[in-house]
Every structure is written in C-alpha cells, then in structure tokens.
Amino acid sequence: MATSQASSLETFTILQTTPSARAARIFGSRLAHTHAFAPAGERIFGEEPPTFAARFGHLGAMGSALLPMAAQGSQPRRFGEFYAEDRLLPYVKAARANGSFGPADAEAIDRLAERLRDGHFDAPQPRLVHTDAALLHGDLWSGNVLWARADAVMDGGGSSSYGSPAYPGLVGRGAADSEAVGVLIDPACHGGHAESDLAQLNVFAAPFVEEIYAGYQEASPLAEGWQERVGLHQLHMLIVHAALFGGSYGPQTIRAARRYL
C-alpha cells in the first residue's frame, strides 16, 4: 500500500506464468472487444481518456517521451493527419539532437508525413469498432502484457486472491483456472487506429503473436491490407525509441519509414 496525505494507491503482485497459443488467441479476442469499447458512442483520433486533462493537461507520456493528446470535443481528424502531427513529427527534433537522425532522415519523415496527411494510409477500423478511433492501450509492446494464471488474479466470483475486485470479465470467457491470461499494464490510452496496438505487439516479438492476431481476426476482422500497414503502425514506437535512446533505433526507424514513401 502506498499512501500520501491526500490519497492512497492499492496494488497487488501479478504472478506470471508461461503463455500458450490458446491463451494468446483468447487475449487477441479480448483486445478486439477492448478496442471497440465506446460508452459515449464516439471517439476521435488522439482523444485523451475522460478526466485526463484535469490532472495532466493534454500531454500524456510514453516512457519519458511526451505524448500529445486531443481534448474531448476537439475537431475530428483523419488517421493520417493525427499520426503525422502527433505520433511522428514531434519526435524528429530529439532524434536529430542525439544523432540517430541526420538531415536526410528528417526529410524522409517529413515526406512520409505528407503522404499520411494526404490520406494514403487511411483504412477502416476493425469490424467491431464503430467510432472514428478505437480505444488503444497506446504502448503495447510485449513487456506491457503480463501472462498470469487465471486463478492467481481472480476467483470464480471475479475477485482476486487479495480480496479486491479483479477480472470478472474472465468468468465465462474461456479461461480455465490454471490457464495463462494476458493482463495489460502501463497504458498510454488514447483514441487511435486499432492496427497500431496490434503492430506494436510485434516490435519486440510478443509470444504467440500470430495467435493473438488470429484471435483478434475471429472476433473483429481487420481491414483488407492490414499486414502491409504493420510497419507503418510500428513507426510511432520506433521513432520514440530513436528520440529517447538514439543508436540503432534511428536507422531502424528510417528503414521502416522508407517502405512507405
């Protein structure tokens, strides 16, 4: 338990286990339903979570990199406009400063941003998503998916072994007590394209990623050509790494970007 004068935060340990192909497929299906969650009936690209601005303003974070957010009720943008302006271009300056981008590299990102703004890579959301933007985790690399035994995080009544409400949604969803379930941590939640979360899972090779994709497709089929857009949707995570850590992330980012020029 962590406490301060004004508030408290209760946490519990997630005991991890080895994932399986079946667990990955179930995780993919549940991720599809998470992306489609929209109680307000609308969501724009870049939209921040409810009440976010009151505490943090309109800037989120991905590690130590700032993440521009759009206020609820802002002017809607297409995917390409949002992705260029808020998920690629803000990180070029830092990548130049640490030497991982040269002038030609920055120019390549600018050219790609123009293609994005022109709508070349706009594509429909998966079938279950009925809003402009899906509800993204936003930083869905493999380390932000923990695989835990179902009975380590919930009991049959939907409570954890620590006595707090945990994951009642797992009940009746096909997760046996001894089976691994995917638990999301450390989100950078915002409205975006569902393909971005899926692509980020494979930046650092999530286990059974093809099974995750298969489970997702069964629940919410992706738009035609999604495989060709995976590299594009990985660019945000790559350019953030180039801006934060430099080194080989710069050339890796530019190689991926040039595929779409």
Predicted regions, residues:
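Active-site catalytic-loop/activation-segment of kinase and kinase-like phosphoryl-transfer enzymes
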Residues: 53-120
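A general structural signal marking secondary-structure boundaries and capping sites
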Residues: 35-45, 95, 120, 124, ...
